[in-house]
């Protein structure tokens, strides 16, 4: 059901839209574009791989996976059905795509760069190419708003109040809501994500998990100094 907010401001929507319960297919639909944000160590990348594996399994293997610019140490720990292209143009169709540290690619200060133009095309054609693009970032401050506005879902994994202070003004009311909802929720926060349905302006928690191939080694592979081919962006 689409909420009727007319020309309401982001602040009004964030303060008045009701919560709902999300099932997997509603929280993480594909194809489309999801933006995943949250504080360091909250499990953003782990959730991205879990989403990827779930969709791969539900599709009977028809949907593959891809990780853009994966660190060298990470590549060898991934299943063979996950591609690791170093360029946006190398991302396969019919796939769930993880773009970690998305602000390095979709950067608001380099909106005219060839990399940003490739990203804009990737996002715009995600449905035609049957792709779910998962953009992972700590916050939206440095992201190009063109990519954010094309998202079907904005997802938070336990955002920090400090990071919300420096969010882009368009996203700040929604991030503040996410912080409040996590503060009110009891239990293990690592097992849930707070979802904003950007198409219908509805909100709610969804259950999350870990991919069968996820490990502490895979986790630390993303936290070390090796940033894969990230240097090609500069």
Question: Where are the regions a protein language model picked out?
Answer:
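N-terminal pre-Walker A segment at the start of P-loop NTPase domains
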Residues: 1-25
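Pre-Walker A (P-loop) beta-loop-beta motif of ABC nucleotide-binding domains
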Residues: 30-31
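Conserved P-loop NTPase motor cores
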Residues: 34-53, 83-172
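OB-fold ssDNA-binding interfaces and closely related basic DNA-contact patches used
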Residues: 50, 60, 69
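Short, flexible beta-strand-to-coil junctions
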Residues: 66-72, 158, 196-202
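Short glycine-rich substrate-engagement loop in P-loop NTPases that contacts/grips substrate
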Residues: 67-92
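Phosphate-binding and hydrolysis-coupling loops of NTP-dependent motor/remodeling domains
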Residues: 170-234
């Amino acid at each position: 059901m689409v909420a009727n907010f007319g020309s309401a401001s982001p602040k009004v929507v964030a303060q008045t839209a009701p919560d709902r319960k999300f099932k997997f297919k509603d929280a993480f639909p594909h194809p489309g574009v999801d933006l995943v944000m949250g504080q360091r160590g909250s499990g953003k990348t782990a959730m991205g791989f879990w989403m990827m594996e779930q969709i791969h399994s539900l599709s009977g293997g028809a949907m593959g996976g891809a990780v853009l610019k994966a660190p060298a140490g990470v590549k060898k720990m991934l299943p063979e059905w996950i591609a690791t292209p170093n360029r946006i143009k190398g991302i396969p169709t019919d796939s769930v795509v993880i773009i970690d540290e998305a602000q390095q690619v979709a950067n608001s200060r380099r909106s005219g760069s060839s990399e940003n133009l490739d990203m804009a095309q990737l996002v715009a054609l995600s449905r035609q190419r049957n792709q779910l693009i998962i953009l992972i970032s700590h916050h939206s401050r440095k992201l190009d708003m063109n990519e954010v506005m094309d998202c079907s879902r904005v997802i938070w994994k336990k955002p920090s109040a400090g990071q919300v202070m420096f969010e882009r003004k368009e996203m700040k009311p929604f991030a503040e809501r996410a912080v409040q909802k996590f503060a009110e929720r009891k239990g293990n926060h690592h097992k849930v994500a707070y979802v904003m349905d950007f198409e219908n302006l509805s909100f709610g928690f969804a259950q999350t998990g870990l991919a069968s191939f996820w490990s502490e080694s895979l986790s630390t592979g993303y936290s070390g100094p090796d940033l894969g081919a990230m240097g090609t962006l500069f």
